[in-house]
From Swiss-Prot:
EC code(s) of this entry: 7.6.2.8
Membrane topology: Peripheral membrane protein
GO molecular function: ABC-type vitamin B12 transporter activity; ATP binding; ATP hydrolysis activity
Record key words, sorted: ATP-binding, Cell inner membrane, Cell membrane, Membrane, Nucleotide-binding, Translocase, Transport
Protein name (Swiss-Prot/TrEMBL): Vitamin B12 import ATP-binding protein BtuD
Species name: Vibrio vulnificus (strain CMCP6)
Family: Belongs to the ABC transporter superfamily. Vitamin B12 importer (TC 3.A.1.13.1) family.
Cellular component GO terms held in the UniProt record: plasma membrane
Localization, UniProt: Cell inner membrane
Gene label: btuD
Length: 254
């Protein structure tokens, strides 16, 4: 996938990067650095009236030139937390998220739904109204739904999953399920782009990191390359140390 000179007015200055199928790309940066703007621009939810320029190429398909309904064949996008717009049960919400126009055998559909529901641990909530869910439960339903849209066995054309701060409403245990879900989607061959404030998660989980500051691309590459002490101190304006605990690298902000 190629992102070429994507920009949004003065909120996001032109930037370009490439990523390969199956890569997990994490977008990091301070509040107001342009993370959500970048993700919504890639997802095609911003219009040219909002100053969006550039292109998103997926296997030579120019994503942003397609109508939103056609874009949804190739990519799924989870914006930041929102409440349910209408009252349905969880299983109905998931059914609404299944790809349309695909002739997939019912056992395959059931297997995909069962796997996603297991990954987000919502087996006992399928017949509960979405209006009765807690914030963390609703976020897990949203995650399951957006993944079903681009689940490879249901939608062989899917290429990209975009998640904007998906861990924000989740507790520690629920966040663990989220990262397992991200791994599952990447293993299916999708590019997964995630905005995340938890820099230790970014450092430990990302294949590539895109570091933004005030709408400008500061660095892009492997986690070790991008999340250097020098880069992090420059962008976040706070002292940083790297330590290892039981062989696992961690960042400490002092």
């Amino acid at each position: 996938m190629h992102i070429n000179y994507i920009s949004v007015g003065n909120r996001l200055l032109p930037l370009s990067f490439q990523c390969a199928a199956g890569e997990k790309v994490y977008v990091a940066g301070p509040n107001g650095s342009g993370k959500s703007t970048l993700l919504s621009a890639i997802a095609g939810t911003l219009s040219s009236r909002e100053g969006v320029k550039g292109e998103v190429l997926i296997n030579e398909t120019s994503l942003l030139t397609l109508p939103l309904a056609e874009q949804a064949i190739y990519r799924a996008y989870l914006c930041q937390q929102s409440r349910p717009a209408f009252n349905v049960d969880v299983f109905q919400m998931l059914a609404l998220s299944l790809p349309v126009g695909r002739h997939v055998a019912e056992p395959e559909v059931q297997a995909a739904v069962r796997r996603v529901v297991e990954l987000v641990q919502m087996q006992d909530k399928l017949h509960r109204s979405v209006q009765a869910l807690s914030g963390g439960e609703w976020q897990r339903v949203r995650l399951a739904a957006v993944c079903l849209q681009v689940w490879r066995s249901l939608n062989p054309y899917s290429q990209l999953l975009i998640l904007d701060e998906p861990a924000a409403p989740l507790d520690v245990a629920q966040a663990k399920w989220l990262y397992q879900l991200i791994d599952e989607m990447a293993a299916q061959g999708l590019v997964v782009i995630v905005a995340n404030h938890d820099l230790n998660r970014v450092y430990q989980h990302a294949d590539k990191v895109l570091l933004l500051n005030q709408g400008v691309l500061t660095a892009y590459g492997s986690a070790d390359e991008v999340m250097s002490v020098e880069n992090l101190q420059q962008v976040f304006e706070t002292p940083v140390k790297k330590v290892a605990v039981d062989g696992q690298p961690y960042l400490i902000f002092t």
